[in-house]
Amino acid sequence: MTNKYIGRFAPSPSGPLHAGSLVAAMASYLDAKAHQGQWLVRIEDIDETRTVADATTAIMDALAVFGMQHDGEVVVQSQRKDLYQAAFERLKDLVYPCGCTRREIADSRLGVAADGAAIYPGTCRHGLAAGKTARTWRVRVPDANENNEAINFDDRWLGPLTQHLASEVGDFVLKRADGFWAYQLAVVVDDADQEVTHIVRGTDLLESTGRQIYLQRMLGFPTPHYMHVPVVLNDVGEKLSKQTGALALDLAHPMDELMKAARFLELSLPPVNSITEFWRVAIAAWARRFAQE
């Protein structure tokens, strides 16, 4: 890893930005600016079933209101399917077709991963059962007794972490039953193609990190530095999202929204009178905590 810094904010266009997504955007923006680096924006619409019309425009307009200027072109995942296909073909010795339904995997009672998904028991690892047709394509992970099964990484917010793919996830999906590429493959390909060196995102994506590092290694890609910041919760302790009733940000009062997000990220800032001044003091405060890492 060189001294250059390329970070990114990668929202899904499933609705307008809310308080939780502003925290993620702010953390990634502050970290990039504190390191005198680039801050990219990527629209992660690989799951086209969740895409909301005009959401991308609304997201970009909101970032502009908050004074967050991106570097380079905005990359859109749905326009990059050839790259994902090429990466999939490079993994041909590790991937296999799977005919299992979600119910069948859940009924295996092998357990549930930290992100709520059932751990895959390896049913189709050695071939499809009689009468089964391929629904998804999975990538084989190392067995629990193999030396490279444990994925170790240093998280810049949480410290040293280890994920065991065999026992915590199992072989995971690269191509979905509906024909769309899985998030894990798309994000790894995009980060490598855009030369992303630092990933700052919410802890809701922490459980994906082991899978992504594994794919990076199998594809010969460099592994970025990771930081997983706390996520905003709703009144009943659920991650704030469009699905849990998150309200759109108040673009008429951007300073109020920025200050709330900064407080959530444990930044103690003096009163400011403009968005430009907010970013000046916020970047300086973030740099004092993280710019030497």
Curated annotation (Swiss-Prot):
Residues binding Zn(2+): C98, C100, Y120, C124
Binding site for L-glutamate: R8, F9, A10, P11, S12, E44, Y183, R201
Biological process per Gene Ontology, one example term: glutamyl-tRNA aminoacylation
GO cellular component: cytosol
UniProt GO MF annotations: ATP binding; glutamate-tRNA ligase activity; zinc ion binding
Coiled-coil intervals, chain numbering: none
Protein name, UniProt field: Glutamyl-Q tRNA(Asp) synthetase
Organism for this UniProt entry: Janthinobacterium sp. (strain Marseille) (Minibacterium massiliensis)
Name of the encoding gene: gluQ
